Structures are given as structure tokens and as C-alpha cells.
A protein has these predicted regions:
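Histidine-anchored nucleotide/phosphate-binding helix
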Residues: 6-24, 33-35, 140-141, 271-286
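Structural alpha-helical scaffold elements that stabilize or flank donor/cofactor-binding regions
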Residues: 118, 246, 314, 331-335
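A donor-sugar binding/catalytic signature common to diverse glycosyltransferases
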Residues: 127, 131, 154, 325-372
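Leloir-type glycosyltransferase catalytic cores
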Residues: 176-211, 370-437
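Active-site donor-nucleotide binding/catalytic segment of nucleotide-sugar enzymes
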Residues: 246-276, 283, 290, 296-300, ...
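Catalytic donor nucleotide-activated moiety binding site of glycosyltransferases and closely related
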Residues: 280-324
Length: 437
């Protein structure tokens, strides 16, 4: 099966991909990896390795475009251009580019990915997580249009499990024909990793991803100056609008903001990557005497995503009150009518506390009792339908039968890993799931 792999290039997992190819389970045509991992991968596979930035700035033969994406296919992608724009914007490599170049980058990647799929007769694309980053999302969207299978690993934050799906819209449904692997993984040995990014990266490694030292200096000078401006603007508007104290005597919905830019909204949020749109829809369905308590995410540090008009728009949504940051999240969960989120863990925390959750995006826990997926016409009565949160553990245990005991994303988990067992688990999983296709 002619295959593209996106990720799975970390030292502890890459051998599983190589064995899948060597054993004829997949025919590895291209492998999208981090630049720093090139030298760690077997020399025999160097000709299939791709780093996404090379697609847009390399004149090497491997990156030549043989076929331009046809107009009718490009038109189907146009509704996603705002999302692609957002995913480019988050990359520091593209600091200070023009609006015209956003379109140039998008079309370069569309043409490359389309050409790659057609030339190599791709039948399957494996993603190590929900596709994010502009090249990955474009490749996923093209695969759907061209009827190429997509296998997506998905980390279930909160229960430390890796699930899979064939389509992002299946996230949270998890309907499979039969259990694939019975997990013997001990949850006590798996913990959340607080910070997956090393603080010891040297300046040289940071410069390597830019065209030259001057490019790095210029972009970082621009970025630092603009960050200073946006930070001061952020402080001003948060002091102006996030001023309300918590009043538990009134009925309210708790709607915590998401960190942006992140995959949880950019990819999994669908059109609700615009998270204020979700709050506007929420405002329409709740009773007139209810309010929406909005609280900023404490980890929001990219101030460009909280511009002046973000705050102006948020403050003008009927029934919204923006809370001071010192308000206890536990108290909000305890006293709210329900929690509203796009894909956040706040919804999972809510149902475990016996409170309903309304979700707007593709979230892994949407199959659990107490969770409602937003649709036009949903009612508060439907969202607040009674549920037994004791059933949550039963549902989670059922889900474990369909989850992968192997680890694919070390950035989110730390684990006393038996690499040989991990390879076997990944291999067994892929052999079983691909043999059913």
C-alpha cells in the first residue's frame, strides 16, 4: 500500500515505521519528519524524508511540482483558506510576510501535496496526531477529496491513551468493528509531561530553520517589537474588560477560552477555530436571565491572538461577563449550569464533576454521558438532560479496548518505555487495522 507517513519520527518509534515498510505492510513513499531527525533515521530511507519548509524554499529535484492542482479541487479547498492562513501565521518562520505571500505559500503546498499524491499513487496517509501545521492540514484535506485513506492517531488528553480514527469527524464516536488490542498498560506508569520543549536549545539550532542569520535577526526583532506592543495592548484590554467578580446567585454557563493558536481549535474546532463564534452561538440558546462567564486561559502567551477587536467583539456579545483571573475554576465548575467549550479538557472535568458539557468541535470524550455536541437548534433542556456520571468509568474502560497501548507522542507523555514492546504494539496495531481495509 503506497503510503505517506507524517511524523512518527522520534527515536523510540521510528523503527516501527521502518519495519512496516521492510515487511511489506506499507510501501513508504514519503516520510514527513523534523529536520533534526534526518540524521537519526536509517540512511536507506534518506531519499523519502521530507521537511515541510523545504517544500516552499528548496530547488532540489525531490521538491519539483509535476502537476498543478486542478481548479475544481482547489475550489473545494478554498473554504479552508482562512484555517490555512491561521496555521501559517503561527509559524515564526513566516514572521512579517505579506498577505499575498500567504496565498503563494498555500498554493505551493497545495500543488506539491497534490502532485505527490498523484505521482506516487498514494493509497494511505498516516498522521501521528490530528493534522495541524499548514502542510499537514492541506495534505489531509486533499486526501479526503481524492479518496485516499487517512489513519490518524489521537491522544486522549486526561486518560493518557492513544486512539485512532479514519476521519476527524469520527473523533469522539470511536465505533469499530471489534477491539484491536487489549491494553495491559499500567496507567500508574504514565504521567502527563508538563513541558515537552527543552529549554536548552541553543541559538544555533534556532537559527538553522531560517534562511540565514540576517533573516533570523530581522524576524526576531520584528517579532519582539510587535510582541511588546501586543502584550501592552493585551494588558490594557484585559484590565478593561476582565473585571467581573463571580456571583453564584445567578444561573450561568462557564465558557473558558482556549489557548491559540493550537491544534485543538485550528484543526479540531472546525469553523469554531473562531472561538468567539461559539460563544455567540451559546448566547443565542441560553435564557435571557442567564449569563456566560468567560475566563482567560492562563497559558495564553501569544498576544497577537487577543487583539483589540477580539476584546471589543467579546465584550459586546449579549449575556457575557469576563471574569478576573483569580476566580477559582473549581468553584465555577461546581456552581455552573453547564460548561461550554470547543474541544477543551474543561468539558471532561465538568462531566466528572456531574455537570453537563456542550462541545463545538471534534473532541475525544464526546461519546461520554453528559456531553452534547452543538448543532443549530439545540436546546438548553437537551444539554441539561440528567446523566449518571458513574457510567463514565464504564465507558472509558470500553474505550480502552479500542486504544493503542503503544506510545506515539512523547511530547505529551512521559513513560518508562520498553521500546521493543512499543514497536511490537505499534506493529501489531497497524497490521490488524490495515488488514481490515
Amino acid at each position: 500500500m503506497n503510503t505517506i507517513v507524517d511524523g512518527l519520527n522520534e527515536i523510540f518509534i521510528q523503527d516501527a515505521v521502518i519495519k512496516l515498510h521492510n515487511n511489506g505492510i506499507i510501501n513508504l513513499k514519503k516520510w514527513f519528519v523534523y529536520k533534526d531527525n534526518f540524521s537519526q533515521i536509517d540512511a536507506k530511507f534518506q531519499n523519502v524524508l521530507v521537511h515541510w519548509r523545504d517544500i516552499i524554499c528548496s530547488d532540489m529535484p525531490d521538491y519539483k511540482i509535476r502537476y498543478i492542482c486542478p481548479e475544481k479541487i482547489r475550489k473545494q479547498l478554498e473554504s479552508n483558506f482562512d484555517n490555512y492562513h491561521e496555521q501559517i501565521y503561527r509559524e515564526s518562520y513566516f514572521t512579517n510576510i505579506s498577505d499575498v505571500d500567504f496565498i503563494n505559500i498555500i498554493d505551493l503546498l497545495i500543488n506539491y501535496c497534490y502532485s505527490l499524491i498523484i505521482v506516487e499513487k498514494i493509497e494511505l496517509i498516516i498522521f501521528h496526531e490530528a493534522p495541524h501545521g499548514v502542510y499537514s492540514k492541506i495534505m489531509y484535506d486533499l486526501a479526503k477529496i481524492l479518496n485516499v485513506k487517512t489513519l490518524v492517531f489521537f491522544t486522549c488528553f486526561g486518560i493518557n491513551r492513544t486512539a485512532y480514527c479514519w476521519d476527524l469527524s469520527d473523533i469522539g464516536i470511536w465505533k469499530y468493528n471489534k477491539p484491536l488490542i487489549n491494553s495491559n498498560c499500567n496507567l500508574n506508569n504514565i504521567d502527563k509531561h508538563e513541558n515537552s520543549v527543552s529549554n536548552s536549545k541553543c541559538v544555533y539550532n534556532k537559527i538553522k530553520k531560517y534562511e540565514n542569520t540576517y533573516d533570523w535577526l530581522f524576524k526576531h526583532i520584528v517579532k519582539n517589537v510587535s510582541n511588546f506592543y501586543y502584550k501592552k495592548q493585551d494588558e490594557y484590554y484585559k484590565n478593561k474588560y476582565f473585571k467581573y467578580e463571580f456571583d453564584d446567585s445567578i444561573n450561568f454557563v462557564y465558557a473558558p477560552l482556549h489557548v491559540q493558536p493550537e491544534m485543538t481549535t485550528a484543526t479540531l474546532g472546525g469553523k469554531y477555530y473562531d472561538q468567539l463564534l461559539a460563544i455567540e452561538r451559546l448566547s443565542e440558546i441560553i435564557p435571557e436571565n442567564w449569563i456566560i462567564y468567560v475566563k482567560e486561559h492562563p497559558a495564553q502567551k501569544d498576544y497577537r491572538w487577543r487583539g483589540k477587536y477580539f476584546f471589543e467583539r467579546l465584550s459586546r456579545i449579549p449575556k457575557v461577563k469576563c471574569l478576573k483571573n483569580n476566580i477559582s475554576t473549581k468553584e465555577l465548575l461546581k456552581k455552573c449550569q453547564f460548561v461550554s467549550t470547543i474541544t477543551g479538557t474543561a468539558g471532561f472535568e465538568a462531566i466528572n464533576a456531574g455537570k453537563p458539557a456542550l462541545v463545538f468541535g471534534h473532541v475525544w470524550y464526546s461519546f461520554l454521558p453528559g456531553v452534547s455536541k452543538y448543532y443549530d437548534g439545540i436546546s438548553v433542556e437537551e444539554i441539561q438532560k440528567p446523566f449518571d456520571n458513574k457510567l463514565i468509568d464504564i465507558k472509558l474502560q470500553e474505550m480502552e479496548k479500542y486504544c493503542l497501548p503503544g506510545i506515539v507522542l512523547p511530547g505529551f507523555l512521559k513513560y518508562n518505555l520498553n521500546e521493543e514492546k512499543n514497536h511490537k504494539d505499534i506493529m501489531k496495531f497497524l497490521m490488524l487495522v490495515l488488514s481490515n481495509q
